[in-house]
């Protein structure tokens, strides 16, 4: 049974204009995600950061709490399987979290569906 659906669209250029990207990265990405970001550069790094931010926004909408007191960016971790498919590997929901990420040059859109009993 579907518990919740969340969708988000984010402008990638917004991340290029960050005044303190290190602080923002530490707030949004887990240690494992930060290590993966370190291996990327240029446009691909911005797409990665925007994509992970957007997934976490979508997840918070599907979960029904938004980001804040009950759920923060560090509670959600995105990884990729052997085929490059995004997977939400760490999250508070007891069921399954399905995720889709798509981006163009300037935007990323994500959708999260939470499924449980």
Swiss-Prot record:
Its Enzyme Commission number(s) read: 2.7.8.7
What top-tier enzyme class does this entry carry? Answer: transferase
Which keywords, in A-to-Z order, does the entry hold?
Cytoplasm, Fatty acid biosynthesis, Fatty acid metabolism, Lipid biosynthesis, Lipid metabolism, Magnesium, Metal-binding, Transferase
Q: Where is Mg(2+) annotated to bind?
A: 8, 57
Required cofactors, per record? Mg(2+)
Where is this gene product found? Cytoplasm
Instruction: Fetch the InterPro entries from UniProt.
Output: 4-PPantetheinyl_Trfase_dom, 4-PPantetheinyl_Trfase_dom_sf, ACPS, P-Pant_transferase_sf, Ppantetheine-prot_Trfase_dom
Q: Name one GO cellular component term.
A: cytosol
A Pfam cross-reference name: ACPS
**Could you list the residue ranges that cross the membrane?**
none
Q: Which domain of life is it from?
A: Bacteria
The catalysed reaction is: apo-[ACP] + CoA = holo-[ACP] + adenosine 3',5'-bisphosphate + H(+)
Q: Which GO terms describe its biological process?
A: fatty acid biosynthetic process; lysine biosynthetic process via aminoadipic acid
What does the record give under GO molecular function?
A: holo-[acyl-carrier-protein] synthase activity; magnesium ion binding
NCBIfam families assigned to the protein according to its UniProt record, in alphabetical order: acpS, pantethn_trn
Entry similarity comment: Belongs to the P-Pant transferase superfamily. AcpS family.
Q: Which PANTHER family match?
A: L-AMINOADIPATE-SEMIALDEHYDE DEHYDROGENASE-PHOSPHOPANTETHEINYL TRANSFERASE (PTHR12215:SF10), PHOSPHOPANTETHEINE TRANSFERASE (PTHR12215)
Full protein name: Holo-[acyl-carrier-protein] synthase
Q: Which organism is it from?
A: Limosilactobacillus reuteri (Lactobacillus reuteri)
């Amino acid at each position: 049974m579907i518990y919740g659906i969340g969708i988000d669209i984010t402008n990638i250029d917004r991340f290029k204009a960050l005044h303190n990207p290190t602080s923002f990265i530490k707030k949004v990405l887990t240690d494992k995600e930060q290590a993966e970001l370190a291996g990327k550069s240029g446009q691909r790094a911005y797409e990665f950061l925007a994509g992970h931010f957007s997934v976490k926004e979508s997840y918070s909408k599907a979960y029904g709490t938004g980001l804040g007191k009950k759920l923060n960016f560090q509670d959600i971790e995105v990884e990729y399987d052997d085929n490059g498919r995004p997977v939400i590997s760490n999250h508070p929901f007891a069921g399954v979290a399905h995720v889709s990420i798509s981006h163009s040059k300037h935007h990323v859109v994500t959708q999260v569906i939470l499924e449980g009993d």
